[in-house]
């Protein structure tokens, strides 16, 4: 009968239990905790050098993972930054290759003329140009007179500044 509280591990040593601050839970404060637990793994990395790593405990949960485990069935498929999923991105290394046709028409940063932008007129520009950028439409004309807010806006006179 093994003395490991979680698994039947013959290599687990109960005399090794010294508290170490690894977390807020009491179960994680064991320096050599159960194999595969966060306490044993963390203490083996940041703990003293003479402490054995969880890889040496011999439990299947603490065996080292393979360095490369492809999840894609094609072994030559490139994942990450060089994949085709971000083919529309024209980074510094991809600038000279075949361009995206949608980016060539308007949104190219190397074009000498910037594309036309539709900006909302600020109140300062409205005072300077007299509102000449957009055609102002009196939208209160179509409103029925039964609405008190609309009828109040119709009766207000536009304020004109004289003598500037």
Curated annotation (Swiss-Prot):
Specify residue ranges for compositional bias: Low complexity.
Answer: 23-40
Ranges of biased composition (kind: Polar residues): 152-164
Q: Where is this region: Disordered?
A: 1-164
Name of the protein in question: Putative lung carcinoma-associated protein 10
Q: Which organism is it from?
A: Homo sapiens
Which gene name does the record give? LCA10
């Amino acid at each position: 009968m093994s003395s490991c509280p979680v698994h039947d591990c013959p290599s687990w040593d109960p005399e090794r239990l010294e508290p170490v601050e690894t977390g807020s839970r009491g179960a994680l404060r064991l320096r050599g905790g159960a194999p595969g637990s966060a306490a044993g793994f963390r203490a083996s990395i940041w703990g003293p050098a003479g402490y054995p790593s969880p890889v040496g405990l011999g439990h299947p949960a603490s065996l080292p993972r393979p360095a490369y485990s492809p999840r894609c069935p094609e072994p030559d498929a490139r994942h990450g930054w060089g994949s085709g999923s971000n083919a529309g991105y024209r980074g510094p290394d991809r600038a000279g290759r075949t361009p995206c046709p949608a980016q060539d028409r308007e949104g190219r940063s190397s074009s000498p003329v910037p594309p036309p932008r539709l900006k909302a007129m600020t109140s300062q520009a409205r005072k300077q140009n007299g509102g000449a950028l957009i055609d102002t439409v009196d939208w209160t004309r179509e409103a029925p007179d039964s609405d008190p807010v609309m009828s109040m806006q119709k009766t207000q006179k536009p304020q004109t500044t004289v003598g500037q």
